[in-house]
Amino acid sequence: TCSSTRFIYTFAEKYIQDEIKYFLNLNEEENILLNQQVSKMVDWHRTFMLPNYATYLNNVADKIEVGDYESDDINKLVEDGRSLIEETIIGLTPYASKFLNHQMVEDIEFMEMKMLTRRQKRIVELSKPENILYKERLERLTSNFERFFGNLNKSQLLLLESHSRVTLNESRIRLHNRTLRQKAFIMFLKTQPNEVDLTSYLNKLLLQGHLITNPSYESFSKISLKKFHVLLVNMIASSSIIQREQIISKLRSYAEDIKTVSGEERQL
């Protein structure tokens, strides 16, 4: 049986290629280089990062199983998850730099236009009436938690409703921040940096972008993460034994799937 994890990973390479090609105006030679770099990127991620993800998920399951899910415990797990994301980004940016530093002035202008098109589409999405945005956010949040908890109880649903309300405007703030970072990236790319400098800049932009664009975003990120941390603590605190057993089972199942995928050869 093909697991959902394996199914998603099978199409990851094609999805990444399509997303990058949306923003880049590539000739035949550049297209070949891009495909090679994306293949190497996915292989690196499968070999070096997936086993770490599996270890992390098993660790979360172990913590919940022994009752280590107080505020400090959850905070440590969230920080460990952030460290994994940082490790992933630092590992992927060198591959991105290999084809990004080949962009000429007209290619960068093409990329800028595509970013604007994608941004305008997102602005339209966020311009829906507030009650619609709230409903959509609550549905996404509920679906994500139900994937692990199963059916949610009344107190958990109230927690999600409250969290959806207090974080409703965060998407607009994130879009504004992304816009600033994209503009800063385009300006830097126009200086025709070498591969090493581009990798260094990408790491800083993606991991510490507030140092380049808007310093206030760091405070927003910390507050937003704190809200999510509080939500996780309260959701698990109000969970039943059956729900926690389901969370543990789901986490270990994902970990096993990920370990299996990490050991597979890339499909040609």
State what each model feature region is.
Residues 17-18, 175-268:
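A cross-kingdom marker for long, charged
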Residues 8-19:
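Alpha-helical transmembrane signal-anchor/signal-peptide segments
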Residues 18-63, 79, 90-115, 156:
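Early exported N-terminus immediately downstream of N-terminal targeting peptides
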Residues 45, 49, 53-89, 175, ...:
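Amphipathic alpha-helical segments
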Residues 93-214:
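Extended amphipathic alpha-helical interaction segments
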Residues 20, 33-34, 38, 89-103, ...:
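Short, structured motif recognition centered on aromatic/hydrophobic residues
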Residues 3-6:
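Bacterial signal peptide processing site
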Residues 39-44, 83-84, 117-121, 166-170, ...:
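A short structural micro-motif
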